[in-house]
Amino acid sequence: LLNNYEKIDVIDDQIGIPTPTTLVTSTVEAIFFNENFMKMRGIYNIAPSGYTNWYEMARIIKLRLDLINTEKFSNKKINPVKSAYFASAARRPHYSRLSNEKLRKTFKINPLNWKVYFKKYIQEQIK
């Protein structure tokens, strides 16, 4: 969007955790190949630690873009707005974090902070 607009509005009141597919697949693999898999099967949440909102993610992306191409993105603006600013038929939760407690206790799997995965993803996209 920043390629096409001088200013974008991004929601800042919906809290969640961006979860990369690489985390999901590596966790499923670790669980599946666990020797006690059949005894411990069930429903588990998986998400990185920490939390954020859409505005914060957009801000981080812009900071990375500024490092790559200062002239192109330096004058672009990202404005935080509330969910009500955008008319939507779909209701969105304002707080949608998942708990990894069961996953931690059962399989001793402790995902890293979402920023670690997000930074890696952004770096891969820039290449």
Predicted regions: what is each one?
Residues 1-16, 21-30:
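NAD(P)-dependent short-chain dehydrogenase/reductase
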Residues 4, 34-35, 124:
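Generic structural signal for alpha-helix termini and adjacent loop/cap motifs
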Residues 8, 17, 50, 79, ...:
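Residues that recognize and position ribonucleotide moieties
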Residues 104, 112-127:
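Amphipathic terminal alpha-helices
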